[in-house]
Amino acid sequence: MKIIKKLYNFCFTGIYKIDLIRTAIVLLRFFYFYYILKNIKHYSESQENNEDHIEIHRNDKKYNVISHNMHFVENLRNLKSTYRKFNGSKTASLIYPFKAIDFINYNENKILSVGPRNEGELFLIRSLGFNWKNIKSLDLISYSSLTDLGDIHNTSYSDNSFDQIVCGWVLTYSNKFEKILTELLRIVKDKGLISIGFTYIPKDIDKKRIYDKNTIPLDSTEQILEKFKNNIEHVYFNFDAKKNDPLKKRHSIIILRVKK
């Protein structure tokens, strides 16, 4: 029975590695849940702590984080753009390095995806070999049972819940990114991995993200290292876009192992 189960998981892992097939599955599920079942849910404004979240200015309009994140359902007829939004490729740089770390147990480890918007990121994680029962995600919006509705500033997960946490392009939408880092540290297990990505944008060209006047935004991985300084066992990867070229908009990525 175990052999059949392993063969089953192996076959589906291989199928999910095929970008076109994986993305097609994600899109079909999205159209079914979002348009047919109309299953979209938002973390309610009464629950959302607006002081934690920034305001976004886009196309001469103001958005909160929830309404801004819903832009992934816009302009779906643009096939190239839609494919990119649903194939999870933006997260590849955060999770593919896991394959170079030999202590990860893909059969047993529990992994959390923070702020995936759609299921593309989750199916990409599954393609690495993680079991569905061990994959969770959390977002302010959800259209399927694969994503828990909630706010990463303050989650309902128990202490030491996850072996790996992937947090891509979330921290810079917060006025209190250190609060999120504290929560990530709480819910990750001892010796667990935290993989973080965010976009560095020089202040003089960052016209979309509007922070509270007293906020010091995240713009360098050095701020993450400082916050975690007493809880870092090893830093496996650290690309700081600001340090590399402070005049250019780019992605910063850091992957580290924590100790508690």
Named regions from a protein language model:
Residues 174-175, 188-190:
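Helix-to-beta-strand junctions that scaffold the AdoMet/dcAdoMet cofactor pocket
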Residues 191-200:
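Conserved beta-strand signature within the Rossmann-like core of class I S-adenosyl-L-methionine
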Residues 164-177:
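A short SAM/SAH-binding and catalytic strip from SAM-dependent methyltransferases
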Residues 109-154:
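Class I SAM-dependent methyltransferase SAM/SAH-binding core
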Residues 206-237:
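Conserved Class I S-adenosyl-L-methionine
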Residues 150-165:
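A short acidic, Gly/Pro-enriched loop at the edge of an enzyme's catalytic core
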Residues 34-105:
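Class I SAM-dependent methyltransferase Rossmann-like catalytic core
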Residues 230-260:
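Core SAM-dependent methyltransferase catalytic element
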